[in-house]
Amino acid sequence: MSSRLSSDATSSSSDQRKSHFKQRAAKNAGHPPTRANRKSVANKKKNATQTALSPKRPLSPAERKVILFNKPYDTLSQFTDGDGRKTLADYIPIKDVYAAGRLDRDSEGLLILTNDGILQARLTQPQSKAPKTYWVQVEGSPQESDLEALRHGVTLKDGPTLPAKVDIMPEPTLWPRNPPVRFRAAIPTTWLAITLMEGRNRQVRRMTAHIGFPTLRLIRYSMGDWNLGDLQPGEWREVTL
């Protein structure tokens, strides 16, 4: 009799635990993913991209794809987006290529896409020292003394920048931006050519703001050995090494 009561108690306890776990599962089913879960999913996507761009052997010329693209304003540097914003898929039909470095949604200009992980690393990793040149319209009239700070490196929130090549340049002949840049009529603007040997998030914008001259328009003109040439916004061409 005692043995049977013990068995019944154990069974009841087990049923209670199962019921508890079912209730928790039902409760959590309608909840949005936690920050930790979102981070895990993001890391998986990042690792998948890195794997796709890290072939175990060098690609042959026939296998390698290299695309030069003039990214328009208000376009994401990726092929998918769940919010209906413009992406690379709106312009480029070629599959299995990935952007070597990114451009912010509100930046324009040269984006290089490739399926070659070795080339992607050569263009983006700091130790490779591939130069990236930007044409930057800033608010105000910086003097040489202002630009010297960028040439020697400035300290941003994520640390000091490497010395940059910075020159005042004539206003380039460009396509109109849509929507147009919003100017303040009483304040002049200046165009700068800025060449970096590194690439951090919104680095050029933060650098010009650091010396007191906010960026109004930013166009990447060249990256490594390639430049925009005569590509218009939304146009692309395939090149060979």
UniProtKB/Swiss-Prot annotation:
Domain of life: Bacteria
GO molecular function: 23S rRNA pseudouridine(2457) synthase activity; RNA binding
Reactions this protein catalyses: uridine(2457) in 23S rRNA = pseudouridine(2457) in 23S rRNA
Bias type Low complexity, positions: 1-14
InterPro entries named among the record's database cross-references: PsdUridine_s_RsuA/RluB/E/F_cat (IPR042092), PsdUridine_synth_cat_dom_sf (IPR020103), PsdUridine_synth_RsuA/RluA (IPR006145), PsdUridine_synth_RsuA/RluB/E/F (IPR000748), PsdUridine_synth_RsuA/RluB_CS (IPR018496), RsuA_PseudoU_synthase (IPR050343), TruA/RsuA/RluB/E/F_N (IPR020094)
Keywords assigned: Isomerase, rRNA processing
GO biological process, one term: rRNA processing
Gene3D superfamilies tied to this protein: Alpha-L RNA-binding motif, Pseudouridine synthase I, catalytic domain, N-terminal subdomain
Active-site annotation: D104 (nucleophile)
Bias-annotated ranges (Basic residues): 36-47
Stretches for region Disordered: 1-65
EC number: 5.4.99.20
Family: Belongs to the pseudouridine synthase RsuA family.
Function: Responsible for synthesis of pseudouridine from uracil-2457 in 23S ribosomal RNA.
PANTHER family: PSEUDOURIDINE SYNTHASE FAMILY PROTEIN-RELATED, RNA-BINDING S4 DOMAIN-CONTAINING PROTEIN
Protein name: Ribosomal large subunit pseudouridine synthase E
Organism: Vibrio cholerae serotype O1 (strain ATCC 39315 / El Tor Inaba N16961)
Underlying gene: rluE
